[in-house]
Amino acid sequence: MKTPKVGFVSLGCPKALVDSERILTQLKTEGYQVASDYDGADLVVVNTCGFIESAVQESLDAIGEAMSENGRVIVTGCLGKDEDKIRQMHPNVLKVTGAAAYQDVMEAVHEYVPAPPKHNPFIDLVPEQGIRLTPKHYAYLKISEGCNHRCTFCIIPSMRGDLVSRPVGSVLEEAAALKRAGVKEILVISQDTSAYGVDTKYKLDFWNGQPVKTKFFDMCEALGQLGIWVRLHYVYPYPHVDAVIDLMAQGKILPYLDIPFQHASPRVLKLMKRPAHSENTLEKIKLWREKCPNLVIRSTFVVGFPGETEEDFQILLDWLVEAQLDRVGCFTYSPVEGATANDLPDHVPEEIKQERYERFMQVQQQISAAKLQKRIGQTMTVLVDSLEDEYPVAVARSYADAPEIDGNVFVEDIDKSTIQPGDMLEVEITDADEYDLFAKLIKIKSV
């Protein structure tokens, strides 16, 4: 009997990527092979995104391609919440499941492609850390599912439910397994990382025989004991985040915070129903930087939200200049089916959204460029992601750069025979542009 093969298409954010990794790990554990193309697959699983309309369309297109090339398709992920929409375009998909529905996906696979009856785990070993879709030297660590907030532009809670935190012992054991597998950097993700454990009332758990609370600070403190890079994403500026800044100042975890502020106008934040919108974020940023001077803050913003006036937008620009954030992403507001923001009055015309986006990015580019210029002459530790094919250059990142969303550090004039992805280098910064740094090698710190 030939080994059954399953094709896999993974779309969406890092949280969806982790869902894909878990499904692939289970498939491999049960003896399935992962097909490298549609033709060789007995069926195809498509993990979808449904956050904004462009992502919905990309997901529907991916389902269509899988149906055309293979014909046997199981759909999962955030868009799976809207089965009617999927079946309206692709009525012959085998099964539709929701986000993080690992067991439902496996049951559907079993129904259409039964697992091999005699799987030998010693022949087809699954690594302790599971199947990963990231490079070997970094990995995403998802600590919870869902969200308790009801931001008016977001439909994630309707897709993924309310906050459900993983037991901290499970989180820490996964992190330790990743380190044992050679991972140098862990990126902590969820819908609301700083709310971790709220739903469990900070339940006590155990790791390495020691009691640990299922709580944001306690988890970060324990992760800091691993001796590898720990990077925090999707953090809201709650008061208890202040204590984690102390861990950053002590060098326990990376001095890097990804905080989706989304806007600065109190009126717009109220329309968005953003959590912590009443916090004086500028004062908080100042306090954090006093505690940890090398702190890097990344954020994302939405311009052109319904009801946003020119005055609101100017408040945002002024805030941006004062905040001096290191890394910033910006999006024009896009209506999302099912979001309550669609019902708000005074939608902003597309041409004004675009004009505000361009003004926003122009201001932030100047800030980013000036901050990177100050790095010239500094010595930094960087993690190598890849080597350029045609040039003696290592593409790396410092503590200030998350993969894929931030800039890079290009280490020039290296001997490529001595360096590989996953190496830690000590470099001197020699130049900068709006987003990236350029450096020369001082020494290889670790391999």
From Swiss-Prot:
The UniProt record lists the keyword Cell division = no
Locate the residues binding [4Fe-4S] cluster 2.
147, 151, 154
Please classify the protein's predominant subcellular localization into one broad category.
cytoplasm
Q: Name one GO molecular function term.
A: metal ion binding
Keyword set, alphabetical order: 4Fe-4S, Cytoplasm, Iron, Iron-sulfur, Metal-binding, S-adenosyl-L-methionine, Transferase
The entry marks the following residues as binding [4Fe-4S] cluster 1, namely: 13, 49, 78
Residue span(s) of domain TRAM: 373-443
**How the cofactor binds, per note?**
Binds 2 [4Fe-4S] clusters. One cluster is coordinated with 3 cysteines and an exchangeable S-adenosyl-L-methionine.
Q: Does the keyword ATP-binding apply?
A: no
**A Pfam family assignment:** Radical_SAM
Q: Which GO terms describe its biological process?
A: tRNA modification
InterPro entries, A to Z: Elp3/MiaA/NifB-like_rSAM, Methylthiotransferase, Methylthiotransferase_CS, Methylthiotransferase_N, Methylthiotransferase_N_sf, NA-bd_OB-fold, Ribosomal_uS12_MeSTrfase_RimO, rSAM
* NCBIfam families to which the protein is assigned, alphabetical: 30S ribosomal protein S12 methylthiotransferase RimO (TIGR01125), MiaB/RimO family radical SAM methylthiotransferase (TIGR00089)
Instruction: State the name under which the record lists this protein.
Output: Ribosomal protein uS12 methylthiotransferase RimO
Q: What is the lineage of its organism?
A: Bacteria, Pseudomonadati, Pseudomonadota, Gammaproteobacteria, Moraxellales
